[in-house]
């Protein structure tokens, strides 16, 4: 199925979640072209608005994208009371209360919180499409090996976070590695 033109802001947010997902990235990369074209969006997966995970996907997508008050109307139009009971799957360092009105506390701002929310979107989109988690993990490890290494603290651009979820700048991380950083979070 192809992505239908959005009939509301809510469907636009769901389309954005799909477009940002690992599976959509994999599909686009496997086309063999070096660029994304407008017609590629018509080939994106369509998620059922009735699926039990739709609201969770929408919340994470909104919190990743509604960064300033310019997006207040979008946040308010897409607001769902179920957002109040939605809990993150992965750890959040800066989880602040949200409500139907956009505030500066609405977006996820810490690098690790944002990365975790995107990972949750990747998994939920896969679940909504019926893709087994093992297949998603295989795609992640084999087709996105650099991202996999970065997520696991390896490589030139490794994602390493401080105790508050902020990503360490590369020069700081490199200096830390020269001093032989601990090999696990417990260290």
Predicted regions and their residues:
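S-adenosyl-L-methionine
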Residues: 1-187
């Amino acid at each position: 199925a192809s992505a239908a033109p959005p009939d509301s802001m809510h469907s636009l947010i769901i389309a954005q979640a799909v477009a940002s997902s690992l599976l959509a990235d994999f599909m686009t990369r496997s086309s063999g072209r070096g660029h994304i074209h407008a017609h590629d969006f018509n080939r994106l997966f369509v998620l059922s608005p009735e699926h039990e995970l739709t609201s969770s996907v929408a919340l994470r997508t909104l919190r990743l994208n509604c960064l300033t008050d310019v997006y207040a109307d979008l946040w308010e139009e897409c607001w769902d009371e179920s957002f109040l009971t939605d809990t993150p799957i992965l750890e959040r360092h800066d989880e602040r209360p949200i409500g139907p009105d956009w505030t500066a506390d609405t977006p996820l701002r810490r690098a690790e919180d944002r990365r975790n929310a995107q990972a949750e979107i990747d998994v939920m989109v896969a679940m909504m499409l019926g893709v087994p988690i093992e297949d998603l993990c295989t795609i992640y490890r084999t087709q996105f090996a650099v991202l996999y290494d970065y997520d696991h603290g390896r490589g030139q651009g490794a994602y390493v976070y401080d105790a508050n979820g902020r990503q360490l700048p590369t020069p700081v991380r490199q200096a830390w590695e020269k001093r032989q950083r601990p090999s696990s979070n417990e260290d």
